[in-house]
Regions:
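N-terminal positive-inside, membrane-proximal cytosolic segments immediately preceding the first
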Residues: 1-31
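Short solvent-exposed coil/turn linkers within tandem alpha-helical repeat scaffolds
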Residues: 24, 79-88, 102, 116-125
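Inward-facing hydrophobic residues that define packing positions of alpha-helical scaffold repeats
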Residues: 75, 112-113
Length: 139
C-alpha cells in the first residue's frame, strides 16, 4: 500500500509541476520543432536553388558563343533569380565576353560592373575588375 501511496504522491507532484510549467515546456518543444523544420526547409530551398542555377549555368556554358540572344536570356535569368549563387557572377563574365565580341561594349561594361559589385566569389570580382579596367584602357 505504501508503494501505491508513494506513486500517487509522485503523480500528484508531477501534475502540480505540469500545471505550473507545462505551457513553457510545450512552448519550448514547439520552438525547437519549428526551428528544426525551418532550418531543414531553408537548406532544402538553398539546395534546390543551387541545383536550378547549376542547370542554367550548364546550359549557358554549352550555348553557342554566336547565339547572343540565348546567352543574354540565360545570363539575365541567372543574375536575377539566382544572384545569391556563384553561378550568377560567372554568367555575368560569360555574357560580358559575348557582348564584347559582338561589339556591344556598353553592355559588356554593365555586366562586368554587375559582376564586380555582386559576384559571390572574390576571384570573379577580381577578374571582372581587371576586364573592366582593360576595356577602359582600350577607349
Amino acid at each position: 500500500m505504501a508503494y501505491d501511496l508513494e506513486e500517487q504522491e509522485q503523480i500528484d507532484e508531477f501534475k502540480a509541476w505540469w500545471k505550473t510549467y507545462g505551457k513553457y515546456v510545450l512552448l519550448a518543444v514547439a520552438v525547437v520543432l519549428f526551428t528544426f523544420f525551418g532550418i531543414q526547409g531553408w537548406r532544402y530551398y538553398q539546395h534546390r536553388q543551387a541545383l536550378m542555377a547549376s542547370t542554367q549555368y550548364e546550359t549557358l556554358s554549352q550555348a553557342d558563343a554566336k547565339d547572343l540572344k540565348l546567352i543574354r536570356s540565360i545570363s539575365a535569368e541567372l543574375m536575377d533569380k539566382f544572384s545569391g549563387t556563384a553561378y550568377a557572377g560567372r554568367a555575368a563574365l560569360i555574357v560580358a565576353k559575348a557582348n564584347y565580341i559582338a561589339n556591344d561594349s556598353k553592355s559588356a561594361k554593365a555586366q562586368l560592373d554587375w559582376a564586380r559589385n555582386n559576384a559571390q566569389e572574390e576571384p570573379i570580382k577580381a577578374i571582372a575588375q581587371l576586364q573592366l579596367a582593360a576595356m577602359q584602357l582600350e577607349e
